[in-house]
Amino acid sequence: MSKYVITKTLNNNVIICTKNHQEVVLIGKGIGFNKKVGMTVQENASIEKIYKLEQQEQQEHYKTLLELGEDHVVQAVIESVNIINESGLITDDKNLVVALTDHIIYAYKRLKQHQMITNPFVIETKHLYSNAYNVARKVIDKLNKTLDVHFPEDEIGFIALHIASNSEKLSIHDISVINKLINKSITIIETDLQHSIDKQTIQYQRFIRHIQFLIYRLTKGEYLEAQENFISMIKTMYPRSFNTAYKILKMIQREFSVYVYEAEIVYLTLHINHFEVQISSE
């Protein structure tokens, strides 16, 4: 049976070991209790997680985080990663475990100090990444119970972003950019229509999903096609919505410094017109 040589004990639940000249992080309840440097650990059921972080910088950062966290917080992180793994949304949790450990440890410290950070994109995250959001809710429910705290819904959104960035192969930055552009688009619509948009409607969900895929197409160099006469017809039928759609596309074009094809304005106009009809019927 394989053995690991202990090089450092971080706490009762986490130890740093080497095996075949490879440094690994072993996590398991009570795995570090009464353990000292130089002792060996067999690979058995007491080891809940084995992390082989490839990059030295990543290794050092993760070890520093684990030293900062209290035993029960580190255990809560382990349980959180298990919940996410069991969801089937991700295939490789190496990057996620570092990001999640970092986030949960500091979120817990902020909560204890009554210094919570507001998440302006909770609704957008909930609609765009519903599967990740549902799993994140389970994570937060578990953290609340395990740590005897009450994280606000903002934290569900933050955890969901970490899950989504791993499951959809997008960086947190990419997702943040998409959310910001959605917010800017909604601001343009609300300004032109002089009315707030209800973010709990199916129409809103469809709109933000459309913006998301529009941005995907731009980043991949893909584009929609539409006949010129169809574009002219939409412009004549829905002039106000068309004008608003034009503003949004110009804004996106500036943000990405890429050309946005005219065909995009057709489908965007139709989405905006749905908002206009919805508002006029109130």
Swiss-Prot record:
Stretches of the chain forming a coiled coil according to its record: none
InterPro entries, per database record: BglG_antiterminators (IPR050661), CAT_RNA-bd_dom (IPR004341), CAT_RNA-bd_dom_sf (IPR036650), PRD (IPR011608), PRD_sf (IPR036634), Transcrpt_antitermin_CS (IPR001550)
SUPFAM superfamilies recorded: PTS-regulatory domain, PRD, SacY-like RNA-binding domain
GO biological process: positive regulation of DNA-templated transcription
Domain PRD: 68-173, 174-282
Pfam families to which the protein is assigned, alphabetical: CAT_RBD, PRD
Protein name (database record): Protein GlcT
GO MF entry, a single one: RNA binding
Record keywords: Repeat
